[in-house]
Amino acid sequence: HWLVLNDLASPTQKMDVEDLLDMLKWPETVAINEPPPGPVLAKDPDALRVIAKAMDSGKIYSGHAPKLPDKILQSYASTGASSDHESTESGEAWSKLTYGIKVMMRQGSASPDMEELVKLAIKHPAASRHMMLVADEIDPVDLTERGHIDATVKRAIELGLDPIVAYQMVTLNA
């Protein structure tokens, strides 16, 4: 089963494959986000069917590939994932970029990975066109004290990222 948050006020519900395929027909559906890597890599027919339908429908397929060994990451990339927000170190992010997966550099209360990954964008400016600055799981206290994506952009610039590139990463690249 896949978990879908269908409304901010609703609890998480289990959805079956047919539900997901129906939801992909909705004009409001713009993406399939973070399909579990286990079924995808195991070539589960249902998982691959949902991904294929999403891609055939012009929807974005955003991946979820934390710390996969290189050969497994190659297989995962071949399923068509356009992006991933699970990189925690530069080497992992570089591998994803090499295999055509855009890297989301997340900055949040639970996952402050951007500070490590921004070094990669500074070192390889051409790769920065395939990288995004994103917010992820920001604690309400952090949100009120530091801000949202604006704080992430500001911090990336403080770390040495060109300001134009930083704003590109939250607009054009996103």
Give the ranges of each region predicted by the language model:
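Glycine-enriched alpha-helix->loop->beta-strand junction motifs that scaffold or abut catalytic
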Residues: 28-29, 58, 75-83, 98-104, ...
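Active-site-adjacent beta->alpha loops and helix N-cap segments on the catalytic face
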Residues: 40-51, 69-72, 93-95, 112-116, ...
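Divalent-metal coordination cores built from histidine and acidic residues
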Residues: 1-58
